């Protein structure tokens, strides 16, 4: 079964990889990576459908849950973790599950990815509901842990999607919205942390970012729900206030303070010329969308 997968085949362009110069190896890796955005483009229609379902889940109080093993699981956890500071959401709104749990983030957990039951246990621990969207991630497209998770999610009526890097993947038959980004043979045979991992990360970026835009977490192209948890982010937050409203940095800093460090509230205060309390009310009525609050 594995030897028939494109991601497991030998790459004809790299049969003499060990004999190449460093620059030659880097050049061919770069050339192979350039193929990834092209194959993702072919999947944009189904990625669009997935985003629409995630937005619908969020609006109903549901969550986006990634589930995967190995590199795929780590990428899901990475994307989920970044949503908290970037969009100011609860850690419970976007969640990443990896076969074998936290220990699997830094070392292999033998047999974990081969257990469908383990995925069910992990999802039950999250109290999965029909309002959630579950995205199964597997470069091979056949990981039992992911299949088990998708099947359980469908039983509960949750929306399911899959991201694989092979055509006609097994997990595609277990998901409502299968995304198949066929990345082909790797530079290093079978090392799907390379092109396949890059493709998965790009698709996850698309899903989480555009879903958050769909629920009001972005104004213009600014991440106005950012959590300014360090000096760099605080400076960025003040700059966003200035850029969105046209005020200088000194004025932006004053509004940053009076808005209790909340960028979108400061923007509404300035552009609508209202108090902090009124800006908060407007944003609540507008479900967090700055344009509608103005």
From Swiss-Prot:
Gene Ontology MF annotations: carbohydrate derivative binding; carbon-oxygen lyase activity; ether hydrolase activity
Catalytic activity, EC: 4.2.1.126
Pathway membership, UniProt: Amino-sugar metabolism; N-acetylmuramate degradation
A GO biological process held by the record: amino sugar catabolic process
UniProt keyword Lyase present: yes
SIS domain sequence ranges: 54-217
SUPFAM superfamilies in the record: SIS domain (SSF53697)
Active site: 82 (proton donor), 113
Keyword field: Carbohydrate metabolism, Lyase
Keyword Lyase (UniProt): yes
Catalytic activity: N-acetyl-D-muramate 6-phosphate + H2O = N-acetyl-D-glucosamine 6-phosphate + (R)-lactate
InterPro entries referenced in this protein's UniProt entry, alphabetically: Etherase_MurQ, Glucokinase_regulatory_CS, MURQ/GCKR, SIS_dom, SIS_dom_sf
Comment field (misc): A lyase-type mechanism (elimination/hydration) is suggested for the cleavage of the lactyl ether bond of MurNAc 6-phosphate, with the formation of an alpha,beta-unsaturated aldehyde intermediate with (E)-stereochemistry, followed by the syn addition of water to give product.
Subunit structure: Homodimer.
Record's function text: Specifically catalyzes the cleavage of the D-lactyl ether substituent of MurNAc 6-phosphate, producing GlcNAc 6-phosphate and D-lactate.
Protein name: N-acetylmuramic acid 6-phosphate etherase
Species for this entry: Exiguobacterium sp. (strain ATCC BAA-1283 / AT1b)
């Amino acid at each position: 079964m594995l030897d028939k997968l494109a991601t497991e085949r030998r790459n004809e362009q790299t049969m003499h990889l060990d004999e190449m110069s460093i620059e030659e190896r880097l050049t061919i890796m770069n050339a192979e990576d350039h193929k990834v955005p092209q194959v993702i483009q072919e999947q944009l229609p189904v990625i669009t459908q997935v985003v629409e379902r995630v937005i619908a889940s969020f609006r109903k109080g549901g969550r986006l849950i990634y589930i995967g093993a190995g590199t795929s699981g780590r990428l899901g956890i990475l994307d989920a973790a970044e949503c908290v500071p970037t969009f100011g959401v609860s850690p419970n709104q976007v969640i990443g599950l990896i076969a074998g749990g936290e220990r699997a983030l830094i070392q292999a957990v033998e047999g974990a990815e081969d257990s469908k039951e383990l995925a069910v246990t992990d999802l039950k621990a999250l109290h999965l509901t029909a309002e959630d969207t579950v995205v199964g991630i597997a470069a091979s497209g056949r990981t039992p842990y992911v299949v088990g998770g998708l099947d359980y999610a469908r039983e509960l009526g949750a929306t399911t999607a899959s991201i694989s890097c092979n055509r006609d993947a097994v997990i595609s038959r277990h998901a409502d919205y299968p995304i198949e980004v066929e990345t082909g043979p790797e530079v290093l045979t079978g090392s799907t942390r390379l092109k396949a991992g890059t493709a998965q990360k790009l698709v996850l970026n698309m899903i989480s970012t555009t879903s958050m835009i769909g629920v009001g977490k972005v104004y213009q192209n600014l991440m106005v729900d950012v959590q300014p948890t360090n000096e760099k982010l605080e400076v960025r937050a003040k700059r966003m206030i200035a850029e969105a409203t046209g005020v200088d940095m000194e004025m932006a800093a004053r509004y940053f303070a009076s808005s209790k460090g909340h960028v979108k509230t400061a923007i509404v205060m300035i552009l609508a010329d209202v108090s902090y309390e009124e800006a908060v009310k407007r944003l609540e009525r507008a479900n967090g969308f700055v344009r509608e609050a103005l």
